[in-house]
Amino acid sequence: IALAAAADLTRTVNYVIDSGSLPMQVGDKGKLTIDVSGVIENVRVLSDQTGDIVFDISKTTFADYPAFNSITAAQRIQLTNTDKYFDDVLNNWTTNIVAGDILRFDVISVNQIRRVLISLKLKL
């Protein structure tokens, strides 16, 4: 039996920023080590409520830690008076991820939102 399509060689990296019952603050919200190599195909963001948030994703290698460089360039992720965001164009992003890279998530500004899910789809 022949397969009609090649296997889906993608992985989704999910990261949750949650401030609990308190207002979310700006700054470094944590780091995540990625264990696969691939290319980011899209980013999807869901928040707990309508509001505003701007954040950046940076990456580094284990050898270069703690120096990080933004992968979003001037195209930071931004929700404005909404609860969701999707981008599959990723203009000027650094989309290559190498196994062992470390991602950092920084909130630049926020209003109303207390919890946000960031999903990066990687093509392996």
Language-model features, listed with the residues they occupy:
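Noncatalytic modules at the cell exterior or secretory-pathway interfaces
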Residues: 92-109
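C-terminal interaction-tip segments
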Residues: 16-25, 29-31, 108-124
